[in-house]
Amino acid sequence: MKTILAAYSGVKKGSGSSILSALHDLPTVPWLTRSKMVKHLQVISVLQFIMTFLTMGIACSLLLMYMFCTDFWVISVLYVAWLIYDWNTPGQGGRRSTWVRDWTVWKYMRDYFPIRLIKTHNLLPSRNYIFGYHPHGILCFGAFCNFGTEATGFTKVFPGIKPSLATLAGNFRLPMFREYLMCGGICPVNRNSIDYLLSSNGTGNAVVIVIGGAAESLDCAPGRNSVMLKKRKGFVKLALKQGADLVPVYSFGENEVYKQLIFEEGSWWRTIQRKLQKFLGFAPCLFHGCGLFFPESWGLVPYCKPITTVVGEPITVPKIEEPTQDVIDMYHAMYIRSLKSLFDNYKTRFGLNESDTLIIH
């Protein structure tokens, strides 16, 4: 047990040497081989990500309120004062931490699926970019691992480019969780935040937007290749106003890691899901993976399915301060064609058939 704890403490600290030294001792334990230990660390790393994003914000909020009623109330008061002072930081570039992005735990999470990043074209550090990420999936494993961490080596694959993954602005109102997100270079998905990154933060910025958003996650399931894009034109308008190039990104396998009960449009359950999604900001999906101890059972652990994120060819976009609707529609159509081409060119390499098509909703 001490060996297990020593290995995982190395994961959290980002110390590869402590992990290896702990693992070298594993052959002395007859029931735990090195390969099994690595697999356990991968599962723990994935669960750490899931539980952090599902519970950290709420748990820290409750803890802060509880501390107000204890002898530690001063800590709560000081943090709330800091929160008020620092309220606008997430929308002004945040506080990226190279140390957090380089944590070894993210590499174990990467290897669980595994997750890969594929470059098709070079990106110029003298330009700014908006990456359109598709599909949303249930928990956006590919988006977070590729753009919220250095597990797949984004800054080495695209030298001079700094990614900023955009997520719900409400997440940055939650104590401590906001600090955690900012360390990964994650920003609010609102106009002010994106405008700041593309206009007041120099060049070489890549804002990653999951275009389909929470609504798209309601249709994510194995074997489905569909994205919500037809009416999503706000990101194109942002790109035109800032002169940022558009880059389509498709993650093959993102929809394969969880199974979901999908209700038909117009049904009573789907109506409830849509209303809750608009009220809460995220979609209440009924999904499951495999169990922690018994793979054939249901649980939160995602299925081990490869996720391959392909970054497509950038579409050069001029800077137009007040783009007309016709211009927005034109570049939106160009983006859709580019995304379809990206999907068709790579689908057979990553588990799909030649007959599979990308459905645009």
Curated annotation (Swiss-Prot):
The keyword Membrane applies. It is a multi-pass membrane protein. GO terms for biological process: diacylglycerol biosynthetic process; glycerol metabolic process; lipid homeostasis; regulation of response to endoplasmic reticulum stress; response to (R)-carnitine; triglyceride biosynthetic process. The chain crosses the membrane at residues 43-61, 66-85. It comes from the Eukaryota. Residues 62-65 are lumenal. Pathway: Glycerolipid metabolism; triacylglycerol biosynthesis. Keywords: Acyltransferase, Cytoplasm, Endoplasmic reticulum, Glycerol metabolism, Lipid biosynthesis, Lipid droplet, Lipid metabolism, Membrane, Transferase, Transmembrane, Transmembrane helix. It holds the Pfam family DAGAT. Residues 1-42, 86-361 are cytoplasmic. It catalyses: an acyl-CoA + a 1,2-diacyl-sn-glycerol = a triacyl-sn-glycerol + CoA; all-trans-retinol + an acyl-CoA = an all-trans-retinyl ester + CoA; 2-(9Z-octadecenoyl)-glycerol + (9Z)-octadecenoyl-CoA = 1,2-di-(9Z-octadecenoyl)-sn-glycerol + CoA; 1,2-di-(9Z-octadecenoyl)-sn-glycerol + (9Z)-octadecenoyl-CoA = 1,2,3-tri-(9Z-octadecenoyl)-glycerol + CoA. GO terms for molecular function: diacylglycerol O-acyltransferase activity; retinol O-fatty-acyltransferase activity. CDD domains: LPLAT_MGAT-like. Its EC number is 2.3.1.20, 2.3.1.76. Its main location: endoplasmic reticulum. It is found in: Endoplasmic reticulum membrane; Lipid droplet; Cytoplasm, Perinuclear region. GO terms for cellular component: endoplasmic reticulum membrane; lipid droplet; perinuclear endoplasmic reticulum membrane. Belongs to the diacylglycerol acyltransferase family. Essential acyltransferase that catalyzes the terminal and only committed step in triacylglycerol synthesis by using diacylglycerol and fatty acyl CoA as substrates. Required for synthesis and storage of intracellular triglycerides. Probably plays a central role in cytosolic lipid accumulation. This is Diacylglycerol O-acyltransferase 2. It comes from Danio rerio. The gene is dgat2.
